[in-house]
Amino acid sequence: MDSAVADWAGSGLAYLTGPRDGPPDYSRVAVLAEARRVTADITRLTGVEVDAAPMLTGRAALRGLSRHGRISAGGATRLLPTADGWCAIALPREDDIEALPALLETDTPPAEPWPAVSAWAAKHSSTAVVARAQLLDIAAAALGEATASVPTVRSVADTAAPRRVDGLLVADFSSLWAGPLCTQLLARAGAVVVKVESFARPDGSRRGEPAFFDWMNFGKLSYAIDFDNDIDALRELLAAADVVIEASRPAAFARRGLSANAIPGRAGRVWLRISGYTGQPGRTAFGDDAAVAGGLVGEGADGPVFCGDA
């Protein structure tokens, strides 16, 4: 067994990739090697020791998850055959289930969601499946539809001299996994991170495993606020922040006057927006369907399977 395969097995990713009742899948061992290169860069830049393996498998370990082939480890997403390929559809929210009659063009909701969605997807092209899901704000992706792209960088103020991370004020408006992990690393590097949540829509990970929420958000200050009635307080925080991280639809911030364009620029401030798809800011994306869009799936004997957890 070569070192990359052994590392994949030892990390727990093999346990999370492959058919439910079959052997683990080793077709994506290079993913962990690349993740280790990325985390080594983070350690070099911040001084924070980061191990890629628990970052990729930690949630599954906390929740006792395992591989389920074309059902995501978390259970909310399916890899489904379409008339011309494969697609992923995610139904993690109550709103997604309520939208199924519109998706399936039926008068009543299906008694069992996934058999009905699977039968519907099989009759349509991947492009048609994704397009209709997008209309209803359901996360969906065709296998391999997305290609790698570089972040879009726009300068709206003067640059500033480089600063150490420790002592920076970070306003974290993100939720779930990607953004909170980013700000967790900044907090570990010494930044003062303020996790901002709406009373009306708190971080969705609060509804899941409490230990996962705690893991992603330890070391941060917590600030719950009414996004519709406490605009001035939010603007003050954004104006004071050295780093802003958000993952909402641009319109959600813009209509409240809280977007990067609405807050006066300041030399050295970094405003990071996390989106699922370049050039499609309103498109919903979660981890498992986004991975399928990028082609990050295991190569099962009879078709693709989910790779790891989200």
Predicted regions and their residues:
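Short hydrophobic-aromatic micro-motifs
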Residues: 79-91, 222-225
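Charged, structured surface patches that assemble and position nucleic-acid processing machinery
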Residues: 142
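N-terminal helix-loop segment corresponding to the beta1-alpha1 unit
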Residues: 1-68, 73, 92-96, 116-137, ...
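Glycine-rich active-site loop/strand segments that organize a redox cofactor
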Residues: 111-112
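Extended active-site and interfacial segments that coordinate phosphate-rich ligands
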Residues: 103-105
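Short acidic-hydrophobic surface loop/beta-edge motif
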Residues: 76-83, 214-216
